[in-house]
Each structure stands twice: as structure tokens, then as C-alpha cells.
């Protein structure tokens, strides 16, 4: 080395950065030749030392870290606990995922940090250890995978796989770990192949954009500069930014000038700036250069090759393009080695310095409760919070920064190194943040419920998306379902029993059904007597076939039973027993059908004056369309609403039109609804005959007058039969719509009246304004009988009205007066229907508390099975507020039935250990938004379980006593805002039927058993104000009653336990798993309380999903969700793996200006605001220019920061000036706006900013334009050279356009000259081709009036301009990255 210089002796390890600094200083001191000689000596020394010893690498050198075992065990324990909390509904899926990732990432990082000290202590000369930190080959990450753990892997999309690989490569991987590992390895291989080509193409585009940028002048004469402040950035970045630049202004310390304008900045000057803390420093950059087609030496600065100002003729554009593109190519190759291992970051924690009590100012203005990112309860600090920890002998003071989470309570005892706060992650820990949507899918079928914390109104009209104002639970109440494929009817009626395993069979039935199938045979439930063993079945007891019909008729009254009706149709004071028969059996036995259809309400409860059955008289049927007409009549509702519940679903008799006359008239007409596209072959108001073709595939059935009318959904074509009468002048017709003339009211001598014996319907037709005629249409008269003979239809015993319960008959017309009736596909239309109304006398004592309950009774005798519909008068606990909470009244056995007749299986010893049968449940109707296509829901026994023992029969007395004491809590008050409450009583119970009636035993029948199904009393929805909503009667969702859990309470003291339980559990309440209900331990499943009985609680199992504010809920309240449906969507920020494979597309995205959500939106707002306000202040000529200038400056700074962020995160250093040259080109155009029309430019034409400015000055008129960001591809196709554009892309189009416009190419760039074969205007060819214009030098300075004016207006006021421009410039990467969110 040079011996004349005294060099300082250093003894420390130097890395790549230190080598760079050394070379830089050597060049400054000794020049290029000496420096290369010195570096040769360093190289020789390095190789000599490296080859002095031979290091071999064996598998035994891979030493596993000893602490790995317990670290992994601890992480697994945390993951298990997290899984439990998620299952209980304490944390939601995103919080679980986030915490799981951070637990494993922290474990992996800790192992990696342990690796180095472990090697240093146990084996400092371990070859793996020496190699991993040499920097030659391999890095700490790869060694960590060999001897630590592979940790979390990324999938090919860069997303995280949340199952970590716990093994390392030394130990070997399990099969699952190997497959996950292959994901990451494949990602590395694919990235290497694909991204290399991407990086090459990126380089090509970059070079296309800037190939014509050459250093052509020494000084462009600009007065502008960009401010850089040492306070706003780390010192390292500050030095990188300044070195090699040229000052735009003189720099003073006090009155002393330490650096002058146009002086280039070296390391010495930078150190002085840092020492004196001068700010701000104004520097020249490519952004400030006055031309877009070239650059001057002073705006570019030093050449990176020889450390002096750049030479004239240097092709700096191509150097810039290569500098940005090349690291992309190089870095893609680097991904292969780490093989897709995820590298992210975790939040920083504040730990307690010692044991002691923590104290802080618990003020609502300073801290308020919140949830951390992991779902833990915490206190959020809104500003700096001073925390004191008092130990025995010392006080520790800590300051928690704002937006941090405090994880401890005030006055809590903390241990040393306990985490007391979590600092908001968003500083330097995370590499990339992006906003991600996470959809949570339902893993079971069920019904959606939520609390009042969810907005019940959807976000938009007709949408099913609801927003959450605060953290709350969503519940999926379990139950299977069978979807009907568009079938508008259900096979099952409410409360029917069903076998869930027959769902598939039912789907096949539904798909093959048509609307014409009147009766459908279906095996509805299989009956077996539960009281006996399965082997010991009754002889000959077969499955019962229940026939369900698609229309109203559930059951048909058989007429064979009339002869022995006195025996089989018994009726006591409060009960009707009516024999029923299915239509299929009737067809088998060839019995004439009496026509009565019995109709059951949805919930099985008849209120007073409810409809029991209806009778369709065949005399009142028609097959044609038409209008019903009758004289004015009194219309009034028979039933008034009473009680609490709005019984929409219970078919009360609320006839629209109650008959008070004895006849009505039907005016027939023929109607065709045709689509708009169909061609009609007849004209409006024309006369046609029978079987005339009126459309392509349609013929008329009757002749008459044609009327064509356009409707919303098509064309209505009506054919009116009758005769046409042209009135004379004497005839005055004042009606337009039509008048009905009943028979006997016309003139006796008139010929027409003889034709129309039944009456006529006169209608005036006006085809034109002056012409009109009258149409006489025939009328059909229907006489209505006084009433049907009940004795002919029902046993006479039922019709006597001396006792309480009775039947009444009411006729009513189905269609209103003048209402049009449309036939549907040749089905007959019933005009009059006869209703049988169930009525009874009310006692004064029980004013409105009585209801009738219908239940099916199947009686099997020797060789004979009969179904009976039994209607009991019971006191309904729902209708009577006093009785609503009383379990005794909610039983379906009426009060006068003796105890020895029915034995409840809950208390019977032989049935103690039997579980509910797997294949049974009841069907219930649920709320459904879509009325046309109902869905069916089944609850099965697989989801229910029970706890605790059954109780003895003795306990019945205790129950009766405790009922009197009113121990159960008020149901309605306790439901509160919890949404739906279901009240179910004794579902699917099997009863012995023991009778002491000697007549039945000896004379006629032996009743072997009677199976009675007890039904759900009422299914209702209750909102937060306590009002009750009824389910929609038209929707048929089927619920089996068996997704239920029995929870039996401790049976030592019923009254006390009942009072205790009632304070904890209320009907409709949701219970999370592991919550305590009673003293005998925690409850094991989540669910909703369905029945509260004195000794047990029945719970319908449910799955809770926690949702936090900002989440969106899909689906409506009460909607049925299927397996795999989206329940809720979370929007959250997550860190992406810090790979250049994510970085390279990001660079490309920024350069192609595709990141809509981050840059463009912000810029558009800024452009609009600037243009609007500055134009208003300064007037037109300057407003657009300054608005566009400032916007462009802002966007340039943001783009530079964003690109630098990506490369710096990979440890790649690119000088800002290279990026600035590229960014200058993509931001140099403005878009001519359409509102300010100009004579020079076309609307939406892209022109250079300088050109727009000069043209505006020359023409002295305002040109309206705004800043516009072009991507690098579009910039390449918008240059001044069509030859360059055509050689890049779209050759034919570019050349054709250029020919049409007559474009001239001045061959100023490199590429054009290469294509033509001329001299390239750079380097040595520069001086021969380009001469400096003498004219430019001769322009006096005062001619720059435009620049002077601008400077006076805005730029000279340094404070204002700095505040606009320098806020974001060279900001810390994290801050600028937060401003422009990742797309």
C-alpha cells in the first residue's frame, strides 16, 4: 500500500457496507488507479486466509438447539388454548389466525436467535456456524431451517399457511410437513422461473421510457430545488440522498456561507451538514430540470462511475432503466434458497422491569377498553401514559406511547418481565401491510341468529349484508335441511314427523313433481312402539303411510265411518274426536269422497272461530277466466284480534267478502298473456271467430271482440264474447267501465233481453275519439244455497250445539267484486268455498285464555288402523299473560284427563335410560325471506345429548307445589334483546294409552297402543322491545325438534334449585360452551335454551361466531344457512412475506400506475382541490399550471418513496436519481380537459406540461388541463418518436397512425438511430451531432418573466412551498408507505 500516508489500524469485522465506504474514501484520496491496486491486495489476502484451512461439512455438524423442545411445547399449548377460545366464541377466526401465526413466528425467531450463542458456547469452530455468518454462501435463515425449525411457510400466492413445520431438516419432516414444505419449495422454483422473465420485461419497458434521456447541457438554468431535512429521515438514508447531488441554493450558518449554489456534495460536506444540523437543504434533482427530453449535468449530479460531475453525452436514461431492472433479476434468483419460508414481524412489547404493583392514571380521556389484535381485553391509550411500578425498594417509571394496548389493570401485581403493554405494530417491524378480506364459512347447517348489536336493516336496499356497530356474537342454531329445487310447495306440513335419512328421497320426489300432482304418496314416518324392546314388536305392525297433498287438503274426512260414527266419533264437553282418512286409502277402498278437507294451523293451536275445515262445492267451479260481480254487501271481519300474538299463521276466519246475498254473477272472458317479443296476428278491437290464430303458437278458444293491452311483463290479449250494438243519437251511454244488468231489469219487449236470460254485462268500447260502440256480454248466474246439511257431512253428534265446542258454517266468495280471475293451465277455479268454523262458548272465568289444540291419534285394533284428529280445549300459556310461565298449563293434556291415563316418559322408570330416537323429529315453520321457494329444515338427534340422571316418579308432587309458588322467572322479561325464543313442550313423547272402558275392550276393539305426538306450542320471534313476530305462513322451513340437549338439574331440592336456575337461565337465552348453569359443573356445549322445566333444561345446540366492528354479516335474521355458506366477512390488515416476489410485482404496479386504491385516489382528490382553489385565487392562466405542477411534484415524491421502500426492504441500494429519471417521464404529461375547449388541442389529448405552459403563454388563452399519471407501457407509446414506439409494441397500429397524421421523427433518441442505422447521439457521437444553441446563451435573464412570476407567486415563499412539497419527500419509508396503502 501507499507508504507515505499514515493509516489508522482497525481491528473489527467489516461487512459489505463498510467495504463500499472504504472504496469511496480511497477513490477520494488516491484516485482510481491506486484504489484498484489496494483492492487487489485485499482480494489476495482474503483468498489466502480462506484457503489456509480446509473446512468440511458433515451431517454431525448440524447441532439441534437444546431449548427447542420446551419452546415448541409452549407454543403448542398456546395454540390449543387459542383453539378452545375460538370454539367458545371468545375470539374470532382472524384473531385466532393472527395470534397463531405470531406465536409460531416468535418461537421460530427465538430459536434463530438462540442458534448463534448456542454454537458459540458449544462449538465455536463448527463449520456450519463459520459458513453461515461468513456472507460467502448461505445465510442464517438456511442454517436455522437445518438446525432450528422450518417454521411457517408461504403458499404460492404469498399467503400464510397457518400450520407450522415444527421439525428441522436435520430431524426430518413428517408427511404433512413435507407436503406443506413442497408448497414453499415449489413457490421458490416457480418464482425463479417466472419472475426472471418478469424482471427482464420490466427492464425492457424501463429502458424504452428513458432511452432518449442524455446529458446535453451543463446547466439548464432552473431556480427550483427540493428540500431535504436531516430530521425527517435516518442518517444513513440522508447521506445516501445527498452524496453526488448538486446544491440548488447557497447554504449559510448564521451569516457565513459554507456551500454555494451549483456545488456538488461530497462526504465531507454531508458530514458538516449533519454536524451543524442545517435544514432544510435545497438540492437539484432530475425533477427540477427544465426539459423532459434531456437532462443537464447539474440536475443529474455526480456520475456513479468516477465520482465527478457526469460528462456531456452520457446516456443516463439507459443507466437508470438498467439500475432499477437489474436488481429485480438478481433478487428473483435469491428466493430459491430460502424456499418460501415466511418472514413477517410481531408487535413490540413493553415488559415490567421488576416485580411490583402497577399504577397509572385511569382516566377515560386517556384510556378506554378495547380488544387487542388477538382478541384479548385491553386498555387503549389515546396519548402518552405514565406508568409506575412500585416494588419493595424502588419505583420504576415507564411511558407507554399512544395507540398502544395496556394489558394489565390498575393496581395489579405484575411479575418481572411480564408483558404489560403492546406497542402498536406499524413501525419498522412489518415489511408489507395489506388489507385482506377473510370470509368465515358455516361448518354446519342451521338457522342464523344475532343480537341487537347487529344492524337489522341491511347496508343497501335489497342486499343481505349487515354491518356491525360493536363486537357481538352470531349464532347458527343447528339443524339439517332439505333444499327444494324451486318447488313452490312442501311435502310436509308443520308439526309432522319425519325421518331425516329420507331427505335425499324427498329431494327426488320434489324434482319429479309437477303442479298437477294432486296427491303424493310418501312414507312419512316409521312407527315403532318405544315402550317395548325392539325385538318384541307388535305382530303385524307395519309402517304407516301418511299421504301429504301439495295443496291445502291435509286430511280428508271419510264417509265410511258414518254407520258406526256413534262409536268412533266421540265428543266430550271440551273435546272433538273426528275420524280422518288419507286420500290414498280412500282411493284403495273406493269410497266416495265427501269433499271436506281438514286444515290444521301451522302451530297446531286453534283460536276461537278458527277455520277447521273447508268444503269446495263442485257446482261453483269454472274453467274460464272472467270477472265476478255482485251487489253491494256488508264486508266485516268475523274475528277480532285478541291477546298478544298476531295470528297471521293460524288461518283465522277472516273472509274478505262475507256473503249477505243469495246469488252472484260471473262474466266469462278469454285472456292470453303473451311475451313482448311475440308477434300478434289480430288487431285491437277486431272481431274473430272460434279457433282463430292469434299468435304464433296460440289459438282462440272462443270468438268475439279482441282487446290488446300492453303491460309491464308482456302483452295482455283479451277476447270478449257477446254482441255489438251501435247506439243511435237518442241512446245516451254515460258509463265507460261497464254495468251489470241482472235478469228481469231490462225492457220486456227488447229482443236482447230474451237472449240474455241470466242478465247482461254492458261495456262501452271507444276505438277512436269520435267512434264508440257497446258490447253486450253474457253472464253466468250462481245461486247460493242457504247452507249445507252438516249431518250429511259429519256425524250428528258433532253438530249439536248444546255443549261447548261446535262447528259453524260460513260461505264466502273467493274473489272480490269486479276482480279479474285468471285461469292457470286448464285448472278449474273455485268461486265459492264453504268454511267450517270451530267455535265454543267462553266461560266468564277464563275470558280469552282458551284455545283448542289439535293432535293426531292413531288407534290400532286387530287388523284395523284408524287415524283420529283430536281437538282439545286447553288453556294456552301464550295467549294468557298470567299463565305464560306455567309449565302445567303448557302441557297439551287438558285438565280433565286423569293422571292414570297418561304417564309422562320423563318420569317412567322403564324408559329411564333410553335416548331420544335417532330418526324422529318434528317439522316447524320458520321465517323465510323468499316466499316463493321455501326451504326445509330438520333437526336430528345426533346433535343432542343429555346430562344427569332422570328423576323418580315421586317428584311429581314436588313439582306441583313449586308451580304454585311461581318459581319460574317471567319469560318475556328475561328474553330481552336475545332474539328468538322457542317454546317447546314435550316433543315427540310416547305415551301408554290405558283405558277402562269395557265396551271398547270386549265388544268392538282392543286398543293395543296409542302413539301421540305432542307438538310445539308456538314458535315465535321476539324483537328487542319485547314485541312478538309471527313466522310467515307461506314459508315452509322444516325443523326437527331434536338438535336439543337435555340438561338435568341436581334433584336434591327442587324448589331452591328452581329459583336459582331461573336467575341464570331464561327461555331463548344463548349459552356459550363451558359456562356454568348450575352447581354440578360447567355446561359442555353451546346452544340456545329451548325449554326450561323444573328439573331440566333443553338446549338446542348452536355454534357461536364472534364478529368485531367493521365486519359484514351475510344473510338475514332467521335465514337458513347451509354448510359452506358465508356467515361473516372480516376486513383486516396483515403482513405479507417480505420476498422480492411480492416486491417485484409491487414495483411494476407502481410504475404501471395500477395501484388504484393507494395512489390514484389520493392524487385525484389532490388534483381537483388544487385546480379548483388555485384557479379561483390566481385566475385561469396560472391556476391550471400551478395546480398541475404541485400535483405532479407530490405524486413524484410519493412514487419514488414507494419504489425505494420495496428495494430497501430487500437490502438493495439504488440511488434516488435513477428512480427519479423514470418517474419524471411517467409524470410529465397532462390531460386536456373537455370543459375548457381549446383551439389548439383536442379534448382528452395527452401533452407535455411544458408544452401546455408555452402554448398557453404564446396564445394568451387559458387551456384547461390536469395532471395525469401514465404507466411505463403507455409512456413508451406516447413519445416524440414513432419509430421507437413501433419497435416496442403494436407496430402496425403505430405506423398506420403516424402515416395518417404525417408525423415527423427527429431521431433524437438512441433507439430510433439504431433502427435507422445512423450515428447514436451519445458519447463520442454526441459532439458531432448536437451543438449547443448560441441563441440560448444570448437570451437576457429578465426575459424569464414567466419563471419570475411563478417564483414571486408561490415558489419564492419557501415556507409555503416546502409545506406542500417536502412533507413526504424522502420521508421515513414506513410513514410514506402508510400514506400510500399497498394495493
Curated annotation (Swiss-Prot):
UniProt main location, coarse: plastid
GO MF, one example: DNA-directed RNA polymerase activity
Record EC number: 2.7.7.6
Cofactors, names only: Zn(2+)
Sorted UniProt keywords: Chloroplast, DNA-directed RNA polymerase, Metal-binding, Nucleotidyltransferase, Plastid, Transcription, Transferase, Zinc
Cellular component, GO annotation: chloroplast; DNA-directed RNA polymerase complex; mitochondrion
Annotated catalysed reactions: RNA(n) + a ribonucleoside 5'-triphosphate = RNA(n+1) + diphosphate
Broad EC category: transferase
GO terms (BP aspect): DNA-templated transcription
UniProt subcellular location: Plastid, Chloroplast
Statement: the UniProt record of this protein carries the keyword Signal: no
Cofactor binding description: Binds 1 Zn(2+) ion per subunit.
Description of how the protein assembles with itself and partners: In plastids the minimal PEP RNA polymerase catalytic core is composed of four subunits: alpha, beta, beta', and beta''. When a (nuclear-encoded) sigma factor is associated with the core the holoenzyme is formed, which can initiate transcription.
NCBIfam families, A to Z: rpoC2_cyan
Function: DNA-dependent RNA polymerase catalyzes the transcription of DNA into RNA using the four ribonucleoside triphosphates as substrates.
Protein name in the entry: DNA-directed RNA polymerase subunit beta''
Species, as recorded: Oenothera biennis (German evening primrose)
Designated gene of the protein: rpoC2
Amino acid at each position: 500500500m501507499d507508504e507515505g500516508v499514515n493509516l489508522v489500524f482497525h481491528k473489527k469485522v467489516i461487512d459489505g457496507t463498510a467495504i463500499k465506504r472504504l472504496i469511496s474514501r480511497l477513490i477520494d484520496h488516491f484516485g482510481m488507479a491506486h484504489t484498484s491496486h489496494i483492492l487487489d491486495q485485499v482480494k489476495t489476502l482474503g483468498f489466502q486466509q480462506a484457503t489456509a484451512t480446509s473446512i468440511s461439512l458433515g451431517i454431525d455438524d448440524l447441532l439441534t438447539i437444546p431449548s427447542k423442545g420446551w419452546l415448541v411445547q409452549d407454543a403448542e399449548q398456546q395454540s390449543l388454548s387459542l383453539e378452545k377460545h375460538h370454539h367458545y366464541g371468545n375470539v374470532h377466526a382472524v384473531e385466532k389466525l393472527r395470534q397463531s401465526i405470531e406465536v409460531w413466528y416468535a418461537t421460530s425467531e427465538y430459536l434463530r436467535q438462540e442458534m448463534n450463542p448456542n454454537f458459540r458456547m458449544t462449538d465455536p469452530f463448527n463449520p456450519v456456524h463459520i459458513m453461515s455468518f461468513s456472507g460467502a454462501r448461505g445465510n442464517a435463515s438456511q442454517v436455522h431451517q437445518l438446525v432450528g425449525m422450518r417454521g411457517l411457510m408461504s403458499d404460492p400466492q404469498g399467503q400464510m399457511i397457518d400450520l407450522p413445520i415444527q421439525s428441522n431438516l436435520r430431524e426430518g419432516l413428517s408427511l404433512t410437513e413435507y407436503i406443506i414444505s413442497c408448497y414453499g419449495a415449489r413457490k421458490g422454483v416457480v418464482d425463479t422461473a417466472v419472475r426472471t422473465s418478469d424482471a427482464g420485461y420490466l427492464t425492457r419497458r424501463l429502458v424504452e421510457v428513458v432511452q432518449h434521456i442524455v446529458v446535453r447541457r451543463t446547466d439548464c438554468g432552473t431556480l427550483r430545488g427540493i428540500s431535504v431535512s436531516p430530521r425527517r429521515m435516518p442518517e444513513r438514508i440522508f447521506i445516501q440522498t445527498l452524496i453526488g447531488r448538486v446544491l440548488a441554493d447557497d447554504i449559510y450558518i448564521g451569516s457565513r456561507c459554507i456551500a454555494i449554489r451549483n456545488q456538488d456534495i461530497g462526504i465531507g460536506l454531508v458530514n458538516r451538514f449533519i454536524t451543524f444540523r442545517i435544514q432544510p437543504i435545497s438540492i437539484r434533482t432530475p425533477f427540477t430540470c427544465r426539459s423532459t427530453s434531456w437532462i443537464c449535468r447539474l440536475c443529474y449530479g455526480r456520475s456513479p462511475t468516477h465520482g465527478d460531475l457526469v460528462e456531456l453525452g452520457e446516456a443516463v436514461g439507459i443507466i437508470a432503466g438498467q439500475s432499477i431492472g437489474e436488481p429485480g433479476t438478481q433478487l428473483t434468483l435469491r428466493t430459491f434458497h430460502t424456499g418460501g419460508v415466511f418472514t413477517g414481524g410481531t408487535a413490540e412489547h413493553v415488559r415490567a422491569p421488576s416485580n411490583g404493583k402497577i399504577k397509572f392514571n385511569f382516566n377515560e380521556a386517556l384510556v378506554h377498553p378495547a380488544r387487542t389484535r388477538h382478541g384479548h381485553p385491553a386498555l387503549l391509550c389515546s396519548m402518552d401514559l405514565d406508568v409506575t411500578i412500585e416494588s419493595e425498594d424502588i419505583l420504576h417509571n415507564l411511558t407507554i406511547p399512544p395507540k398502544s394496548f395496556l394489558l394489565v389493570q390498575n393496581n395489579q401485581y405484575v411479575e418481572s418481565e411480564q408483558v404489560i403493554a403492546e406497542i402498536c405494530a406499524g413501525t419498522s417491524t412489518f415489511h408489507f401491510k395489506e388489507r385482506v378480506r377473510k370470509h368465515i364459512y358455516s361448518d354446519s347447517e342451521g338457522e342464523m341468529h344475532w343480537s341487537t348489536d347487529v344492524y337489522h336493516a341491511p347496508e343497501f336496499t335489497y342486499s343481505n349484508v349487515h354491518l356491525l356497530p360493536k363486537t357481538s356474537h352470531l349464532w347458527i342454531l343447528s339443524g339439517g335441511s332439505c333444499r327444494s329445487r324451486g318447488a313452490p310447495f312442501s311435502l310436509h306440513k308443520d308439526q309432522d314427523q319425519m325421518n331425516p335419512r329420507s331427505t335425499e328421497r324427498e329431494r327426488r320426489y320434489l324434482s319429479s313433481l309437477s303442479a298437477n300432482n294432486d296427491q303424493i304418496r310418501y312414507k312419512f314416518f316409521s312407527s315403532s312402539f318405544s315402550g317395548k324392546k325392539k325385538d318384541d314388536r307388535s305382530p303385524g305392525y307395519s309402517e304407516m303411510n301418511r299421504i301429504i297433498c301439495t295443496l291445502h287438503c291435509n286430511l280428508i274426512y271419510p264417509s265410511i265411518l258414518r254407520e258406526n260414527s256413534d262409536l268412533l266419533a266421540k265428543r266430550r264437553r271440551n273435546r272433538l274426536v273426528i275420524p280422518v282418512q288419507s286420500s290414498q286409502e280412500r282411493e284403495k277402498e273406493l269410497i266416495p269422497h265427501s269433499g271436506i278437507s281438514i286444515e290444521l294451523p301451522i302451530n297446531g293451536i286453534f283460536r276461537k272461530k278458527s277455520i277447521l275445515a273447508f268444503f269446495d262445492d263442485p257446482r261453483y267451479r269454472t274453467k274460464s277466466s272472467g270477472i265476478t260481480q255482485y251487489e253491494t254487501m256488508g264486508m266485516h271481519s268475523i274475528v277480532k284480534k285478541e291477546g298478544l300474538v298476531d295470528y297471521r299463521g293460524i288461518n283465522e276466519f277472516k273472509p274478505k267478502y262475507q256473503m249477505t246475498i243469495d246469488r252472484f254473477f260471473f262474466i266469462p272472458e278469454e285472456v292470453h298473456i303473451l311475451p313482448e317479443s311475440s308477434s300478434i296476428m289480430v288487431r285491437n278491437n277486431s272481431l274473430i271467430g272460434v279457433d282463430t290464430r292469434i299468435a304464433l303458437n296460440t289459438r282462440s278458444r272462443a270468438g268475439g271482440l279482441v282487446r290488446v293491452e300492453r303491460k309491464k311483463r308482456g302483452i295482455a290479449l283479451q277476447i270478449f264474447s257477446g254482441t255489438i250494438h251501435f247506439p243511435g243519437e237518442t241512446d245516451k251511454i254515460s258509463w265507460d267501465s261497464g254495468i251489470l244488468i241482472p235478469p228481469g231489469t231490462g225492457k220486456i219487449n227488447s229482443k236482447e233481453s230474451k237472449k240474455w236470460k241470466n242478465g247482461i254485462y254492458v261495456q262501452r268500447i271507444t276505438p277512436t275519439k269520435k267512434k264508440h260502440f257497446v258490447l253486450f256480454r253474457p253472464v253466468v248466474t250462481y245461486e247460493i244455497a242457504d247452507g249445507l246439511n252438516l249431518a250429511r257431512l259429519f256425524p250428528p253428534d258433532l253438530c249439536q250445539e248444546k255443549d261447548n265446542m261446535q262447528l259453524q258454517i260460513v260461505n264466502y266468495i273467493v274473489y272480490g267484486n269486479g276482480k279479474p280471475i285468471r285461469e292457470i293451465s286448464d285448472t278449474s277455479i273455485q268461486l265459492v268455498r264453504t268454511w267450517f268454523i270451530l267455535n265454543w262458548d267462553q266461560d266468564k272465568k277464563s275470558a280469552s285464555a282458551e284455545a283448542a289444540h289439535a293432535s293426531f291419534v292413531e288407534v290400532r285394533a286387530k287388523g284395523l288402523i284408524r287415524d283420529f284428529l283430536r281437538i282439545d280445549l286447553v288453556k294456552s300459556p301464550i295467549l294468557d299473560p298470567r299463565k305464560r310461565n306455567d309449565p302445567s298449563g303448557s302441557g297439551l293434556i287438558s285438565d280433565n284427563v286423569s293422571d292414570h291415563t297418561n304417564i309422562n316418559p320423563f318420569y317412567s322408570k322403564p324408559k329411564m335410560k333410553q335416548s331420544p330416537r335417532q330418526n324422529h323429529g318434528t317439522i316447524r315453520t320458520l321465517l323465510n325471506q323468499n316466499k316463493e321457494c321455501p326451504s326445509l329444515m330438520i333437526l336430528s338427534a345426533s346433535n343432542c345429548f343429555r346430562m344427569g340422571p332422570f328423576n323418580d316418579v315421586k317428584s311429581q308432587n314436588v313439582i306441583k307445589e313449586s308451580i304454585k309458588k311461581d318459581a319460574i322467572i317471567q319469560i318475556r322479561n328475561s328474553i330481552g334483546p336475545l332474539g328468538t325464543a322457542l317454546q317447546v313442550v314435550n316433543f315427540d313423547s310416547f305415551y301408554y294409552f290405558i283405558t277402562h272402558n269395557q265396551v271398547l275392550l270386549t265388544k268392538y276393539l282392543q286398543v293395543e297402543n296409542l302413539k301421540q305426538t305432542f307438538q310445539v306450542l308456538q314458535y315465535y320471534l321476539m324483537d328487542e322491545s319485547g314485541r312478538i313476530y309471527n313466522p310467515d305462513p307461506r314459508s315452509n322451513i322444516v325443523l326437527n325438534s331434536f338438535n336439543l340437549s337435555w340438561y338435568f338439574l341436581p334433584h336434591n331440592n327442587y324448589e331452591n334449585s328452581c329459583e336459582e336456575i331461573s336467575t341464570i337461565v331464561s327461555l331463548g337465552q344463548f349459552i356459550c360452551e363451558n359456562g356454568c348453569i348450575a352447581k354440578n359443573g360447567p355446561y359442555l356445549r353451546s346452544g340456545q335454551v329451548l325449554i326450561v322445566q323444573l328439573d331440566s333444561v333443553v338446549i338446542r345446540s348452536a355454534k357461536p361466531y364472534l364478529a368485531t366492528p367493521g365486519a359484514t354479516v351475510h344473510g338475514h335474521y332467521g335465514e337458513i344457512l347451509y354448510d359452506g355458506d358465508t356467515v361473516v366477512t372480516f376486513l383486516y390488515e396483515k403482513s405479507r412475506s417480505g420476498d422480492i416476489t411480492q416486491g417485484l410485482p409491487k414495483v411494476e404496479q407502481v410504475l404501471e400506475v395500477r395501484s388504484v386504491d393507494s395512489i390514484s385516489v389520493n392524487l385525484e382528490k389532490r388534483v381537483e382541490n388544487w385546480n379548483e382553489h388555485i384557479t379561483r385565487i390566481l385566475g385561469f392562466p396560472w391556476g391550471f399550471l400551478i395546480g398541475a405542477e404541485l400535483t405532479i411534484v407530490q405524486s413524484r415524491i410519493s412514487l419514488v418513496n414507494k419504489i425505494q421502500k420495496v428495494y430497501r426492504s430487500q437490502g438493495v441500494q439504488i440511488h434516488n436519481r435513477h428512480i427519479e429519471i423514470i418517474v419524471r417521464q411517467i409524470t410529465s404529461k397532462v390531460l386536456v380537459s373537455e370543459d375548457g375547449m381549446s383551439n389548439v388541442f383536442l379534448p382528452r389529448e395527452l401533452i407535455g406540461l411544458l408544452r401546455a405552459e408555452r402554448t398557453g403563454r404564446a396564445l394568451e388563452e387559458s387551456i384547461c388541463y390536469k395532471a395525469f399519471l401514465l404507466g411505463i407501457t403507455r409512456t413508451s407509446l406516447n413519445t416524440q418518436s414513432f419509430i421507437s414506439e413501433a419497435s416496442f409494441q403494436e407496430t402496425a397500429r403505430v405506423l398506420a397512425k403516424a402515416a395518417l397524421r404525417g408525423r415527423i421523427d427527429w431521431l433524437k433518441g438512441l433507439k430510433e438511430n439504431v433502427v435507422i442505422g445512423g450515428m447514436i447521439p451519445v458519447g463520442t457521437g454526441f459532439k458531432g451531432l448536437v451543438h449547443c444553441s448560441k441563441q440560448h446563451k444570448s437570451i437576457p435573464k429578465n426575459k424569464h418573466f414567466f419563471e419570475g412570476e411563478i417564483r414571486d407567486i408561490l415558489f419564492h415563499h419557501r415556507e409555503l412551498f416546502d409545506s406542500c412539497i417536502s412533507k413526504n419527500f424522502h420521508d421515513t419509508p414506513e410513514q410514506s408507505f402508510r400514506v400510500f396503502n399497498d394495493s
